[in-house]
Amino acid sequence: MDQFEYIITLEFGNQNQVESAYQIFKSIPKKLKAKSIGEESIKSNNQDWQDWRVCDLEIDMITDFKNQTSKEEESDLITSQYLGHGIIRLFKLSNANNTLNEKEILTIPGDDTMICILFVPTYFTVHDLLHFYIGDDIVNKQVSNFRILRNQQKGMGFNFTVLIKFRNALDAKNFKEEFNGKSFSRMDPETCHVISVKEIVFQKKLFQRPAANEDFPYLLTDPFTVKKKKELVKVELPTCPVCLERMDSETTGLVTIPCQHTFHCQCLNKWKNSRCPVCRHSSLRLSRESLLKQAGDSAHCATCGSTDNLWICLICGNVGCGRYNSKHAIKHYEETLHCFAMDIRTQRVWDYAGDNYVHRLVQNEVDGKLVEVGGSGDDDNNDIGNSDELQNVVYGNRSKNGEKSNSNKKDGELAANFLRHREYHLEYVQVLISQLESQREYYELKLQEKDQTASDSSNVESLKKSMEDLKLQFQVTQKEWQKREMAQKSKLEEDMLVIEGLQANLDHLSKKQEQLERENKALEESKQDLEEQVKDLMFYLDSQEKFKDADESVKEGTILIQQPHGAAQASKSKKKRNKNKKAGK
């Protein structure tokens, strides 16, 4: 947050008082500082002061006696000295504005700290809006400025627009998320519409800048339409008309109402009245008169254009002529079943379903039943206009239901009649609003059901068509699949036969191969046996030929032939054969 500096200026009636005050301030200890002391432009010394702030000026100083060498220690002494007769002004160092050409289009870019509440109903007072709806915490801690604008454009209705400038962008974002779409009250279906202000574009200055030598500059500068400033200048802080304290948007929130008077937010909250504390401007009275004037000029039947015996539908606002004319109001009921209609001239409410008047029905506090109020009291006429709350109910309810009147006298009589029976009228307003709300919800539910039924029927028809198409596609696909299945089955049978033949051949060949392997093995064994026998026979013949002439000892000897280690079994078998041969000999 930026740090600001303030300047105190003392304005006196003559030069002697200025010099005297200056000498007094020079003698003050360094603890007390005065930024500037001077004489403002005064036409004459004997000029009559026109400012309510003019008074006798005195300065209080604290004298320290603790450093004195006295036995008894004295406390600090507060002394006062008269300066003169004048005004104390408090200035704030602010940034100077850049000179702009009024003929050119000016664009003031936003900094995401400004939001706007659109279409605030006219029955909301400033106190209700700030204190009850927005809340004291937001008003006192987050908001720097409020500005309330009234809409008087034809066709847009009579309502208010509230500009709110926050101290930082995060608070503005949180405010928009919390209040956008929030209902203004339980009995009013209207909701709060909060938008962010991106920039402000205008062709001329919104307010005329005050001259540098004027005593009361207008609100320092307008926080909603002034760019960021660069040069520092002195600007006097204005005072709040309610509490007479200085108004600074950096320390407390400020609110500007439609009559362009500015106050502290907490001061206006304490002023529980719809009128301005300065000029007594009442937004409710002006909006009501404007609404009645606009409605009286444009009241006519929506079908035939008749201006006599008009009835307005309380459900949708349709205006039609009565049963003594072309009966367009009754036809509207027969077409839409909107059973409540109000006579624009007398403000009486007729129930087409019950075929009777219901504008005098209130809710009994004992058992909650609807009872009819009879008779009229003779209350004092001085009660008219004394209660802002009743004016809010009467005028706000009439402006909301779009009533139309051509005579101010009849309007006054109607208002007097409402205020004579204030309790009954409050009950009537609550009951009527609740009944209308239930009617609105009922018919909205019926319309939603009708739309849902129509959409469901169209969806069913489309689903039926798609179902038929899918059935045809399924039948075609099923036939193709059956053909493919038969072909695949025949092919599968052929393949199975081939596989069975191949498997039989494979088994036969396997058996034949095993038989051949066994025969081959037997032949190998017989071959080896025959080879050994031939070898033994050849050895026997050779040895017999060699040893035929030898001695008996040599003939009876044994011949050993060394064989490899791996052929042990073969040698054993050979020995057995040799023994067998010898035994045979």
From Swiss-Prot:
Segments forming RING-type zinc fingers: 240-280
Residue(s) of cross-link: Glycyl lysine isopeptide (Lys-Gly) (interchain with G-Cter in ubiquitin): 369, 410, 450
Sequence segments annotated as region (Disordered): 372-410, 552-585
UniProt GO MF annotations: nuclear localization sequence binding; ubiquitin binding; ubiquitin protein ligase activity; zinc ion binding
Residues binding Zn(2+) 2: 313, 316, 332, 338
Binding sites annotated in the UniProt record for Zn(2+) 1: 301, 304, 321, 328
CDD domains: RING-H2_BRAP2, RRM_ETP1
Name used for this protein in its record: RING finger protein ETP1
Source organism per UniProt: Saccharomyces cerevisiae (strain ATCC 204508 / S288c)
Gene (name only): ETP1
